[in-house]
């Protein structure tokens, strides 16, 4: 017989010990309402909208906000979902999956509140909160009619699209991006636009049926059941559905008595035995939150990776890969390299000759795109057998900051090219690259992608950028990595991890020093191009040190 789940309780109060069955639930409710109203009054009527004032203004009627920013604002601080450290090893593969936490419990038990408290206490920047509310099935016309009259059971396992939930969670655990539907509770349908979620170190999945599917259970590394008194859950549901989802009191109570309460007793309450931790009183139980956070921290420590150090010691004494193409070193190209490498070169000259090299590099890279035979007619009415681009579209993605300087050269030779950006910076404390921001065009998976960065030393930032593209389902053989200058170490690292990525540059230098600078190198390209002060101990490919 399986051991019963652990119950994490709050510190008992010496002055007011719990004496009644519903005391813990009331204590949690007091804690929650005190945060909202700064009042100790405990009245169910106070939590409901005034009867005579009509329906409350609708605040949010969908499962999630489409314009939700990539951050979590709390009473203490703002936690940005940025600065993600490497989620792969030196081979370019994910060595360990993300840590997935499942939060189950009855409707309005405080699962989302507990999830946000865990996120705040974790203080880990890359966390994804995935709500089961987004995965309600698309209703038929008959079911739509039933839902409009509060006669459809949304608290039954059949109401959820478990196939989509499982596939979404699997991709997130693999570090890939996913599309999540946005469910409209007023029309009981999915919105046309879906929200994009990106892979993270920690995934928190919450929902009333979080433990109702065996396959789903196997994906969860930690299972938490939020146990809240039924009266409190009813009050919270009334307040939420009336003020946020545009429902009326009679309809909410009818649905609760007919579907919600019976479904809780039949499907949700029995899953408590499957939980690793049971959290009584929900958000009021700080001891439980601390226990959960400590365990997650220990799991994350086991998943820490040091990619840059591994890259520096790997792939030594190997011949340059066949996927590398170096622009022919003509006297003109070598002359421009002489100018931009010279520390005495003025900023104006540095920019001018860098742009010339970029244009040549882009033109050279385009020759590796797929072309097919085509025939056109000349103005003289004669046929000409030529070539035309055989792909769907070309997209340029620049690794900020220095990679942005290559965008004008790409636009000059590729008409109507789409541009995306990725911000990767070095954490000055760990020396590891961190992903801070990305903006990619839609449907990028079918495009040939030109990834641009002006210098590549160890290849750590370039590998992270390639991983981002792969997580967006861009085929590896459709990615072209372009750089004005590379070190042999960076070339080997990228080619070994991603053997089908085409690497194109104007020159390859032999070595990298202890500060991960290319030798003889070009200096810090971003600082020389933009005229900013150099960052001590920074690398060529990471121009701005992380200060968070």
Curated annotation (Swiss-Prot):
Cellular localisation: Cytoplasm; Nucleus
Cross-referenced Gene3D superfamilies: 3.40.50.2020, P-loop containing nucleotide triphosphate hydrolases
EC code: 2.7.1.48
TM annotation in the entry: none
Residues reported in the UniProt entry to bind ATP: 105-112
Coiled-coil features, chain-numbered ranges: none
NCBIfam families per the UniProt record, alphabetical: PRK00129.1, PRK05480.1, udk
Function: May contribute to UTP accumulation needed for blast transformation and proliferation.
Name of this chain's protein: Uridine-cytidine kinase-like 1
Gene symbol of the encoding locus: UCKL1
